[in-house]
Amino acid sequence: MHVQRVVVPGSGAESWTVLDGDGVPVEPLERYLAYLTDVERSPNTVRAYAFDLRDFWVFLAGRGLDWRAVRLEDIGEYVAWLRLPAAGRGGEVAVLPSVAPQVAAATVNRKLSALAAFYCHQARHGADVGGLLSAWRPAGQRGGWKPFLHHVSKGRPAPRRAIAVKTPRPLPRVLGPEQVQAILDACDHLRDRFLLALMWESGCRVGEALGLRHEDIAAAEREIAFVPRVNANNARCKSGQPRTVPVSAGLIRLWGDYLHLEYGQLDSDYVFVNLFAGPRGQALTYPAVYDLIRRLRVKVGFSFGAHWLRHTAATRMLRDGVPIEVVSEILGHGSVAITSAVYGHLTAADARRALEAAGWFTGSEVSW
């Protein structure tokens, strides 16, 4: 089985499907992935779901199981199967117990989330999936859908088992002020400097920056609007809701310098366009940004990613005392809980600053 990129007739939208060994689309996956495309899920999300569900179908085929007759125990075996080396999944090679898992716990949980979403969608549309969903409580399952006759049984306890692999919560990777300055100073062009400065100050995502239009920048008000829309470069606003973010006068001046000294008379709605490679004036793409990051890593001598600038912005705001509700709105999170879960981390230095500000280390009633 393999995953195939497809283009939706008429709209030209990008989607993905899963083909069996004969090159025929796997029907339930084909319909589900088409549904995700129809409801405007990100192409990257649809692609990830396609690969995750492909893996489950390979597992089912290896055990001769029908997807509609899967039991909770089969899901548990699937988790164990995922963590085997590729050579051990077919059963031809014995795997010693001491061999480390080949798939990270976070990846396993992501695949389980995709699988849970698929089964919930099938049940919602009348497919008979047996008693799987009545026994399985996927980790982090959300949504307002409730099964038929839910009102009859909602007061009764219905214990369900969660299947998830324990994962340590990774801390967001952030950059220090000297590192950010080094990155900006290493940029050869104002366009690149403005792009990275925008991400560091506003906390926007790469896709939100690449989809930016000139009309989205209100220079007098020093505000930038990030608006979900279809973009020629496939850039996307992940949040799905427009938001307006205040920015500094310095960032607006940098935008003006970029327009005056590099952008010139180009006729394009997009703020970030090809100027030095590729079709001049065409909207800048994700690969172009990732290539820029790779070149800058070599120049500055340390590793970083584009998303680190967003993490740095959020962490800096919170450390400077910006209320978490404001930070959540600026980042475009769906809820404050998301912001708290991602950025509610403290280093020892953060804790010391908070305790010193509260006078914890001075004026003690007990002497040592």
Regions found by a protein language model. Give the residues of each.
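Conserved tyrosine-mediated DNA breakage-rejoining catalytic core shared by Y-recombinases
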Residues: 207, 211-253
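Flexible interdomain linker/hinge and immediately adjacent N-terminus
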Residues: 128-181, 275-280
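Short, charged phosphate-coordinating catalytic segments
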Residues: 125-129, 199-222, 280, 325-326
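Active-site/catalytic core of tyrosine-dependent DNA strand-transfer enzymes
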Residues: 248-301
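N-terminal core-binding DNA-recognition domain of tyrosine recombinases/integrases
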Residues: 29-44, 54-150, 182
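Short, basic (Lys/Arg/His-rich) helix/loop patches that form interaction surfaces
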Residues: 290-329, 333-336, 345, 355
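Basic, Lys/Arg- and aromatic-enriched nucleic-acid-binding interface segment
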Residues: 167-206, 210, 266
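C-terminal secondary-structure termini that scaffold catalytic or DNA-interacting sites
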Residues: 1-4, 278, 358-368
